Amino acid sequence: DAGSDLQSVRLKATFDDEHNCWRLNGVKRFITNGDADIQLVLARSEEGTTDGRGLSYFLYDRRDNAVTVRRIENKLGIKGSPTAELVFNNAPALLIGERRMGLIKYVMSLMNGARLGVGAQSVGLAEAAYQEALQYAQQREQFGKAIIRFPQVYEMLGLMRAKIDATRTLLYETSRFVDLYKTYDSISKERSLTAEERQDMKYSQRCADMMTPMLKLFASEYANQVAYDSVQIHGGSGFMKEYKCE
């Protein structure tokens, strides 16, 4: 039930001294690719805690037969990535990294990549919807001329193009900042960074942390708007499955 409030994760992790491993118990919902054999999972390892400082990161193998996929969600889209509800019944798991750092350090570091993925996916979807609308508007004739020659349709296509180009620019700039700070992080494992490099790394990370949620917001919103407008330009045909914009 935690949803986006990751600090409220309630899946419980307890250490099994006899078998020298961690055990996971509880339910998790809306888990991306939840039917995979190997999974990373955030769980509460510190008894009595209620915030992010009590969460650790674990790896489990579903082939241990201690995790049940209770259901696969029937989603509106993104059907190639199963979203599952999982039940953990004393599932053995391995601790990843340090205790108590699951959310603060590890999950948050993965969020930038996930948000970039959503942004790129949204830009691609919007571009495809625009191209379908443009092609249809150029070919479909009403009242003796192609509908792209009607001001309302031409203006709608222009706004769609502007939204896509703006979002693509935000995607590329956000990706640049993520690349920079990750590159500096990799270099720092081989040698000490100069003062200028450390400053640039911190700046790039701050920009990435700020821009990735913005990218996810605007890209996904504009993708929905562009897809909707594509259906509108297709008219009644946009409601039919034989047309790709549906």
PLM region descriptions:
Residues 21, 25-67:
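A short core secondary-structure module
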Residues 63-66, 70, 82-114, 131-149:
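A glycine-rich, basic-preceded beta-loop-alpha segment at the flavin cofactor/substrate interface
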Residues 8-10, 19, 35-38, 52-55, ...:
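Active-site lining segments that contact anionic ligands and/or coordinate catalytic metals
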Residues 1, 28, 45, 62-64, ...:
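A broadly conserved detector of short glycine/acidic/proline-rich loop/turn motifs that flank catalytic sites
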Residues 1-4, 30-32, 49, 75-82:
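Short Gly/Pro-enriched turn/cap motifs at secondary-structure boundaries
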Residues 1-16, 48:
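Beta-sandwich/jelly-roll carbohydrate-recognition scaffolds of carbohydrate-active enzymes
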Residues 6-8, 16-17, 21, 87, ...:
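Alpha-helical interface subdomain recognition
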Residues 9, 27-28, 69-74:
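Short beta-alpha junctions and helix-cap segments that line functional grooves
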